[in-house]
Amino acid sequence: MLKGLSPLLSADLLYVLASMGHGDEIVLADANFPAATHASELIRLPGVSVARVLDAVLSVMPLDTFVAQGALTMQVVGDADAVPPAVADMQAVLARHGCSPAGSLERFAFYERAAGAFAVVATGETRVYGNVILRKGVVLQGGNE
């Protein structure tokens, strides 16, 4: 445990976040996501919702503001405009952290993009479509407050 940090930020997750450079991507995945298949580095946070993990990650990592969307969710198959509850919760977390709303990718495009991610965090999220790709932004000298 460390002061001032979410207990969800395990040593492994902090190491990955610190090792990532500007433009690197990390996937926060639900329990149904084929995380082991797509992960070059796999971190497991069982029993924790994707929104809680997103909140913890955004407390220490800025999203990339040099791209249209620093966060991307998976579109609902057959209804690209649908907003599942897990995605609505993630959008609320993004807004709370002052981030732009997440964009979305078609399911197989999401899987393809996830395969190139720096790491995948397998959460305990049981709701469908609880997946998001985060693109790391620039950490400014003195922080991004």
Give the ranges of each region predicted by the language model.
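Long, charge-dense
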Residues: 46-68
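Long, hydrophobic N-terminal alpha-helical segment
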Residues: 1-44, 49
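Surface-exposed, low-hydrophobicity beta-strand/loop segments enriched in small/polar/acidic residues
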Residues: 72-76, 87-88
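Structural motif
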Residues: 24-27, 41-43, 64-66, 70-73, ...
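Fold-independent oxyanion-binding glycine-rich loops
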Residues: 5, 29-31, 36-38, 45-46, ...
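Conserved phosphate- and dinucleotide-binding cores of soluble alpha/beta proteins
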Residues: 4, 34, 64-66, 138-143
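Glycine-rich, aromatic-bearing surface loops/beta-hairpins
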Residues: 80-145
